[in-house]
């Protein structure tokens, strides 16, 4: 059984044609991307590395990592999003190998294949996030890096990420997030530890409504990223 929520998939498929519009529904992803890209690259040194981007959507992160010289494969379960990703790759001239396949299925086919695995803004949209973490560990080479980003689960994150972002500032379409699926850093670290992934770094991402920019922070109370390594 696929570890995917049909309702979640449909939400993103319906918006797929707007994925690369920096002023539309995916504007926050465009604004987040330089921060997450530089953070990933600072740890993993992407040039020349084989990289898997799980839940790649329309390919914003996938293309940016490929632009740094990585050999990138992006996977997703949205046919529409992958169609947009393929088309944009052709238009931009940035080569990314896209495939419609579940992370668990690819893990069974290609264990220990990738230097770097990324799973960004995806875990909070699946029924069984721990299974995705386990697939990431299987897919990465010994000594490789795995990067996650998701949303903390507390009153502040509900107010900021759901009420604030979706209903007040209208940065995101209403219903983008299900608060019950938010994941505390301790829970994500526990998922990783259970698969023998070692946590190497954790950083928060903070949005300033005045400057309208995201910045890295020690504050992990809303958005955060976790870097893990599979020991050699």
UniProtKB/Swiss-Prot annotation:
Alphabetical GO biological process terms: methylation
Pathway: Cofactor biosynthesis; ubiquinone biosynthesis
Organism, as annotated: Paraburkholderia xenovorans (strain LB400)
Name this protein carries in UniProt: Ubiquinone biosynthesis O-methyltransferase
Record PANTHER family: METHYLTRANSFERASE (PTHR43464), UBIQUINONE BIOSYNTHESIS O-METHYLTRANSFERASE, MITOCHONDRIAL (PTHR43464:SF19)
Family matches, as SUPFAM superfamilies: S-adenosyl-L-methionine-dependent methyltransferases
Similarity-based family: Belongs to the methyltransferase superfamily. UbiG/COQ3 family.
EC number assigned by the record: 2.1.1.222, 2.1.1.64
């Amino acid at each position: 059984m696929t570890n995917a929520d049909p309702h979640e998939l449909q939400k993103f498929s319906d918006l797929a044609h707007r994925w690369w519009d920096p002023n539309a529904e995916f504007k926050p992803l465009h604004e987040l991307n330089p921060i997450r890209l530089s953070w990933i690259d600072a740890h993993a040194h992407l040039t020349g590395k084989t990289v898997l981007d799980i839940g790649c959507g329309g390919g914003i992160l996938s293309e940016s990592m490929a632009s740094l010289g990585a050999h990138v494969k992006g996977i997703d379960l949205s046919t529409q999003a992958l169609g947009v990703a393929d088309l944009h790759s052709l238009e931009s001239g940035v080569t990314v190998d896209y495939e419609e396949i579940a992370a668990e299925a690819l893990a069974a086919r290609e264990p220990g294949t990738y230097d770097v695995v990324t799973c960004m803004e995806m875990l909070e949209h699946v029924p069984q996030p721990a299974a995705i973490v386990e697939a990431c560990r299987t897919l990465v080479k010994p000594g490789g890096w795995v990067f996650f980003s998701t949303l903390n689960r507390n009153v502040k994150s509900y107010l900021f990420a759901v009420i604030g972002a979706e209903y007040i500032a209208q940065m995101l379409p209403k219903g983008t997030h299900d608060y019950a699926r938010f994941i505390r850093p301790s829970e994500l670290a526990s998922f990783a530890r259970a698969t023998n992934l070692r946590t190497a770094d954790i950083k928060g991402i903070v949005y300033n409504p005045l400057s309208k920019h995201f910045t890295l922070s020690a504050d992990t109370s809303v958005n955060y990223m976790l870097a893990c390594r599979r020991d050699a």
